[in-house]
Amino acid sequence: MQEKHTFFRPLDSEELPFPKSQAPALISGMVQSLPDCWQQTSALALLPSLSVACGGVTYGKNAKPLAFQIAVYGLAGSGKTQFTCRPAQVVQSILSARDDLARAEVKGQVQDCPKVMGFEISTVMLAKYLQHAGNQTVMLYTDEISSAVGSDKGGNAFMQLHSILRKGYDGTAHTMDYKEKDSFRGCISPRLSFLACGTPHAVFNYFNNKAVEEGSTRRVIFVEHPYHEQHVEELAYSIESKEALENELYYLQSQSGNLDLDAVEKAVLQWKEQKAAACGDDRVAKLMINTPADIFRRATYLAYVLNHYEQLGNAIFFGRWVAEYALRCAMNLTYSTQKEIEKIDEKIFSTSSAEYHSHFNEQMLASLPETFSFQDVVNYRKAHTEYSGDKCSPSIISRWKDRGKIKQIQKAIKNVQPALYQKIAN
């Protein structure tokens, strides 16, 4: 059971160092001048932008998008935007510039979806754009989620994006109503990544307990940007390195198709079984492995494309590293909330399931006297359940009679005598 405790181990670069040698060269090259602690965080922050660059590639039996949803949190002024998110910003700027160039060439008449959009976008405008995204993954970005979301009481009317973010992660259909000249119902199947930054309070104010319960938070990798005391020079990329990056992104944008490799699936299942075995009887912990296992697949296939469909072993190593971070992140940040939700759900399940009712009815029969009346059954149910009326009591008595557990020894005569029943000894 020792392995179980590793689920809650720290996320820092000493515990879970960035795999420089196994990571795709594009990622390693963009983060190599940063301190180790920020190489780890900036590599993770790059995933959404690179998923957009590989936006035509899908994976698995259901052709899911290589979407990643990352929320970076750290102290105000600690360098989240300047360091952890800087490589991602460079990729985003190239993708956006290419978008602008394409529009300029057709004099702005193309109704396509921008590759990178701000978190401040309204749900209506986002839906309109996503209708034109085709089979491409796009992303939302904000370097300060508190200004994008709005007030502390849940965000403004334009930022109720949880449902679209959740659907966009898996590329499943999302239906919404909005009104222009006439009423219109739009159905979209978004492929949506995002990168958001903020202080811990701002990030977890948006991805709150409600978001945990509805599933939005489960898909997010929360990346902790650590405080670094030593001075670090601002990230700068040479003209040559930017040109090489532009060429690489151009290649990635030309890629399409669906990836589904047995070697990847075998590695993911082996990792998943290992983690599940360490959970014992903890059902919540076992369920929380599922999304990191899916992230394992996504990160592996993304790395495989970045490696030009070579070095599959390194791609699997990198995917496992991302999955390990995602799992530890989930266990440290949302496990306790999930456990509380399970307690509530357990109570609902246990009082609505056939198994519960069967067990309860057996206890009731054992507690009743050897000879009892219909009213005795009603009184017992009132004392031990949230009683909702007498309609269930006749059915319970009928089942007991049919199964040979009781017999009727006196018929009811209205306003004269009650029906009486007697237990039958087994």
Identify the role of each PLM range.
Residues M1-N426:
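Phosphate-handling catalytic cores of nucleic-acid transaction enzymes
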